[in-house]
């Protein structure tokens, strides 16, 4: 629930944002200089978390207000929808077998993760589902903020999984070449078109789609309307070829700072000993999920004769940009890898809100 719009509340929100974003930007730039993957997401999360945890006087002032967070989510949903294009159905027909295998692996990985977290570790269903679902870390963190109290736990699970993928995939593929992929990933992020390089019509279309989608989604009672609404609208318009919205560099960085900073602020207010058990569970869950995808890729490669490494990169949930760039470095079919990752993420984010809504309101 948003704070009342009093002068004091507005001042408090702006103060929190300034402190949080100053730390987030500084930490993000350091991570970028060090060549880490997703530097502004990891930098903002860990920077705000560590500094907030160490410096008690600013701890209570950290955070990102909801009135700022929601517009960022609206724009993020629009950009996610832009991953689908008019050629989506052609790809689906030519890659039918691998798509079916990827969908099956996603279901199996999710069920295996749920079994471990619910039956063995006794997690609540919603927290367990959000923690083990093999989707994009930033988007799941966005969703979790509205659904669970411990969204920082969800963030930990996904950060651990992505870190394991990015550290292990290069070793599996070609020993020590992973750093090349990290550098290429960061170069791709920097090469995204700037907001100042785009025509006003494109920016207007981006803003209009993001804004219009929210009331429409609320009117037709979509779950999580601020994310699902623009995601569906953007997907449909991109598939029909009516619009083409690129990933806007400044907005992608802003989304990373907002999401990472918000989660880092919450982590800073939780004692580390309370997090230790979740970190252990996150490693176990990540191994279960990644092993499921790896075994599926191995079985399909044995059956069809397709390249195991290419299938592994196409299936394994380790970040669209990072894994796609690993495919580029090692000479695999980039479209194949990117398509399967995009489809998996879209599958998760179209299905997840409805699954949660159904389990919360079974009637």
Predicted regions and their residues:
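Membrane-interface helix termini and inter-helical loops of multi-pass transporters
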Residues: 85-94, 175-197, 241-247, 273
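Membrane-embedded alpha-helical segments of transport systems
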Residues: 135-140, 154-177, 292, 320-322, ...
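Intrinsically disordered, low-complexity non-transmembrane regions of multi-pass membrane transporters
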Residues: 1-22, 129, 153, 177-200, ...
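Transmembrane alpha-helix boundary signature
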Residues: 56-61, 80-95, 111-124, 298, ...
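Small-residue-rich segments of transmembrane alpha-helices in multi-pass membrane proteins
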Residues: 70-81, 105-106, 132-141, 162-168, ...
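Alpha-helical membrane segments and immediately flanking helix-loop junctions
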Residues: 120-160, 308-340
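Juxtamembrane and boundary regions of transmembrane helices in multi-pass small-molecule transporters
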Residues: 112-123, 165-186, 298-304, 347-363
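Structural signature of multi-pass alpha-helical membrane transport proteins
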Residues: 2-67, 75-87, 196-271, 291-298
């Amino acid at each position: 629930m948003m704070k009342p719009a009093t002068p004091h509340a507005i001042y408090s929100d702006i103060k929190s944002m300034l402190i949080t974003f100053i730390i987030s930007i500084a930490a993000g730039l350091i991570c970028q200089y060090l060549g880490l993957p997703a530097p502004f997401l990891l930098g903002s999360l860990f920077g705000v978390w560590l500094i907030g945890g160490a410096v008690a006087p600013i701890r209570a002032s950290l955070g990102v207000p909801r009135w700022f967070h929601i517009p960022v989510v609206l724009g993020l949903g629009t950009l996610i929808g832009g991953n689908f294009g008019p050629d989506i159905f052609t790809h689906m027909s030519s890659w039918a077998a691998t798509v079916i295998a990827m969908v099956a692996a996603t279901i199996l990985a999710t069920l295996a993760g749920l079994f471990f977290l619910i039956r063995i570790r006794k997690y609540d269903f919603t927290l367990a589902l959000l923690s083990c679902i093999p989707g994009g870390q930033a988007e799941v963190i966005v969703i979790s903020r509205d659904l669970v109290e411990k969204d920082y736990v969800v963030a930990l699970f996904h950060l651990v999984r992505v870190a394991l993928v990015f550290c292990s995939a290069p070793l599996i593929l070609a020993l020590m070449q992973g750093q090349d992929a990290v550098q290429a990933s960061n170069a791709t992020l920097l090469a995204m078109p700037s907001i100042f390089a785009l025509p006003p019509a494109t920016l207007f279309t981006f803003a209009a789609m993001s804004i219009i989608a929210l009331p429409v989604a609320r009117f037709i009672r979509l779950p999580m309307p601020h994310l699902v609404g623009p995601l569906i609208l953007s997907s449909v318009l991109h598939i029909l070829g009516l619009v083409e919205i690129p990933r806007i560099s400044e907005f992608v960085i802003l989304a990373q700072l907002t999401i990472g900073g918000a989660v880092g602020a919450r982590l800073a207010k939780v004692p580390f000993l309370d997090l230790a058990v979740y970190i252990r569970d996150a490693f176990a869950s990540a191994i279960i999920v990644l092993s499921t995808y790896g075994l599926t890729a191995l079985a399909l490669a044995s059956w069809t004769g397709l390249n195991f490494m290419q299938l592994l990169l196409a299936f394994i949930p380790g970040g669209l940009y990072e894994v796609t760039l690993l495919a580029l470095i090692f000479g695999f079919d980039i479209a194949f890898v990117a398509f399967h990752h995009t489809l998996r993420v879209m599958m998760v984010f179209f299905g997840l809100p409805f699954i949660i809504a159904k389990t919360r309101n079974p009637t």
